[in-house]
Curated annotation (Swiss-Prot):
Pfam families: MerR_1. Keywords: DNA-binding, Transcription, Transcription regulation. GO terms for molecular function: DNA binding. It comes from Rhodobacter capsulatus (Rhodopseudomonas capsulata). InterPro entries: DNA-bd_dom_put_sf (IPR009061), MerR-type_HTH_dom (IPR000551). This is Uncharacterized HTH-type transcriptional regulator in himA 3'region. Residues 10-63 form the HTH merR-type domain. GO terms for biological process: regulation of DNA-templated transcription.
Amino acid sequence: MTKSAEAFRTITEVAELLETPTHVLRFWESKFPQIKPVKRAGGRRYYRPADVALLVGIKHLLQ
């Protein structure tokens, strides 16, 4: 079953989508204040579709 386009994604799901390690996503989060995933219990990150789109753009610009 696939998630809705509007569903929140975990850092692992976003990393797989972008083919980018999770530590890189955390680093980008520390350098780009526009990336603001929702943090839930235990500090787990959940990325909104807008966050994912922003990360796609950042990856594209850094390549």
